[in-house]
């Protein structure tokens, strides 16, 4: 197993241009596929999740051209649902942002499709989405465990009608259903069961759908109306924002050991909810400066916070490790969906924080972190989870340094993360 030793960093200073958002990249690729016309996507993320989506689209007959650095994609839209005359098997790795939307999109046309992935993907639930698609007439069959991939889709189109979908587990299910509803055979009315988690991710979806010419009537995130007769039309060019979750590590670095750190590609005009991470840092005491497309974080004495972070679930992980440098006990609440991500992030975070001496209380949907007097070095397991690896890079700011096991798992969203992180040291 590869390991990366991070020695103590005493100060950070500099600017980081954040790579494209994973969530926006895969949503935009699918909408561009369904749209009329050719779309040029710029600042596309070059990572594992995007490669799985691109490979699947190519297998399904979608034509696109990638730039040499794979951050610009010119894609010829189908202007129609995806159809296939032969059975297709698509391998999607552990890419939830490909599995969920493709599962929904492939019900729109005609053909037989098998969706599969890595072993961890077979542990990530998809039942709430499948239940909703079945209410609209989709024929979806599980191949192993009920409610989980792999699965088979026998597509004949999606009916109009009223549909209920659970909102309390993952916003990706609703995102997938929203994106395909305009191409159903009539009006679709979606009712949310339970509390909708991660609402800002739904805002990303709605903003992108609007960019491609489709309107959704949003009744306070409890009901959504999608009128028939709409179609996706390419806007010509789509700029993929920087990944706000990935910005969180550099903003935390500035707050802990700045100097100042400036991240570009996200800012006050961002459509991503995870930019609110900067507000949490500010509540902890950091000095934050906002621009339209940048955020600056400056060093400060950090204090613990007690907050509901359901709206920023990915970026909230960075607060858990930043808490090691704050005074007091930090409480991160309403984050049950950490458990169904690339790994069970609540259990993994608690285990690894304890290795460095933190006192941790892990509950059903919360985690509390009390920092040790002095963190001690450890070998941090990353669970093939990119965000675990990046979060624990914060331990380079402790006097002991840290060893990251399997650092290359960051390839899911940020392949050169550790090089960019090291470049800030001064």
Swiss-Prot record:
<dbReference type="GO" id="GO:0009073">
    <property type="term" value="P:aromatic amino acid family biosynthetic process"/>
</dbReference>
<dbReference type="GO" id="GO:0008652">
    <property type="term" value="P:amino acid biosynthetic process"/>
</dbReference>
<feature type="binding site">
    <location>
        <position position="172"/>
    </location>
    <ligand>
        <name>phosphoenolpyruvate</name>
    </ligand>
</feature>
<dbReference type="InterPro" id="IPR006264">
    <property type="entry name" value="EPSP_synthase"/>
</dbReference>
<feature type="binding site">
    <location>
        <position position="96"/>
    </location>
    <ligand>
        <name>phosphoenolpyruvate</name>
    </ligand>
</feature>
<feature type="binding site">
    <location>
        <position position="171"/>
    </location>
    <ligand>
        <name>3-phosphoshikimate</name>
    </ligand>
</feature>
<feature type="binding site">
    <location>
        <position position="314"/>
    </location>
    <ligand>
        <name>3-phosphoshikimate</name>
    </ligand>
</feature>
<feature type="binding site">
    <location>
        <position position="341"/>
    </location>
    <ligand>
        <name>3-phosphoshikimate</name>
    </ligand>
</feature>
<dbReference type="Pfam" id="PF00275">
    <property type="entry name" value="EPSP_synthase"/>
</dbReference>
<comment type="function">
    <text>Catalyzes the transfer of the enolpyruvyl moiety of phosphoenolpyruvate (PEP) to the 5-hydroxyl of shikimate-3-phosphate (S3P) to produce enolpyruvyl shikimate-3-phosphate and inorganic phosphate.</text>
</comment>
<feature type="binding site">
    <location>
        <position position="172"/>
    </location>
    <ligand>
        <name>3-phosphoshikimate</name>
    </ligand>
</feature>
<feature type="binding site">
    <location>
        <position position="27"/>
    </location>
    <ligand>
        <name>3-phosphoshikimate</name>
    </ligand>
</feature>
<comment type="pathway">
    <text>Metabolic intermediate biosynthesis; chorismate biosynthesis; chorismate from D-erythrose 4-phosphate and phosphoenolpyruvate: step 6/7.</text>
</comment>
<feature type="active site" description="Proton acceptor">
    <location>
        <position position="314"/>
    </location>
</feature>
<feature type="binding site">
    <location>
        <position position="387"/>
    </location>
    <ligand>
        <name>phosphoenolpyruvate</name>
    </ligand>
</feature>
<feature type="binding site">
    <location>
        <position position="337"/>
    </location>
    <ligand>
        <name>3-phosphoshikimate</name>
    </ligand>
</feature>
<dbReference type="GO" id="GO:0009423">
    <property type="term" value="P:chorismate biosynthetic process"/>
</dbReference>
<feature type="binding site">
    <location>
        <position position="124"/>
    </location>
    <ligand>
        <name>phosphoenolpyruvate</name>
    </ligand>
</feature>
<feature type="binding site">
    <location>
        <position position="22"/>
    </location>
    <ligand>
        <name>3-phosphoshikimate</name>
    </ligand>
</feature>
<dbReference type="InterPro" id="IPR036968">
    <property type="entry name" value="Enolpyruvate_Tfrase_sf"/>
</dbReference>
<dbReference type="GO" id="GO:0005737">
    <property type="term" value="C:cytoplasm"/>
</dbReference>
<feature type="binding site">
    <location>
        <position position="22"/>
    </location>
    <ligand>
        <name>phosphoenolpyruvate</name>
    </ligand>
</feature>
<protein>
    <recommendedName>
        <fullName>3-phosphoshikimate 1-carboxyvinyltransferase</fullName>
        <ecNumber>2.5.1.19</ecNumber>
    </recommendedName>
</protein>
<feature type="binding site">
    <location>
        <position position="170"/>
    </location>
    <ligand>
        <name>3-phosphoshikimate</name>
    </ligand>
</feature>
<feature type="binding site">
    <location>
        <position position="345"/>
    </location>
    <ligand>
        <name>phosphoenolpyruvate</name>
    </ligand>
</feature>
<comment type="subunit">
    <text>Monomer.</text>
</comment>
<keyword id="KW-0963">Cytoplasm</keyword>
<feature type="binding site">
    <location>
        <position position="412"/>
    </location>
    <ligand>
        <name>phosphoenolpyruvate</name>
    </ligand>
</feature>
<feature type="binding site">
    <location>
        <position position="23"/>
    </location>
    <ligand>
        <name>3-phosphoshikimate</name>
    </ligand>
</feature>
<feature type="binding site">
    <location>
        <position position="198"/>
    </location>
    <ligand>
        <name>3-phosphoshikimate</name>
    </ligand>
</feature>
<comment type="similarity">
    <text>Belongs to the EPSP synthase family.</text>
</comment>
<keyword id="KW-0028">Amino-acid biosynthesis</keyword>
<dbReference type="InterPro" id="IPR013792">
    <property type="entry name" value="RNA3'P_cycl/enolpyr_Trfase_a/b"/>
</dbReference>
<keyword id="KW-0808">Transferase</keyword>
<dbReference type="InterPro" id="IPR023193">
    <property type="entry name" value="EPSP_synthase_CS"/>
</dbReference>
<keyword id="KW-0057">Aromatic amino acid biosynthesis</keyword>
<dbReference type="InterPro" id="IPR001986">
    <property type="entry name" value="Enolpyruvate_Tfrase_dom"/>
</dbReference>
<dbReference type="GO" id="GO:0003866">
    <property type="term" value="F:3-phosphoshikimate 1-carboxyvinyltransferase activity"/>
</dbReference>
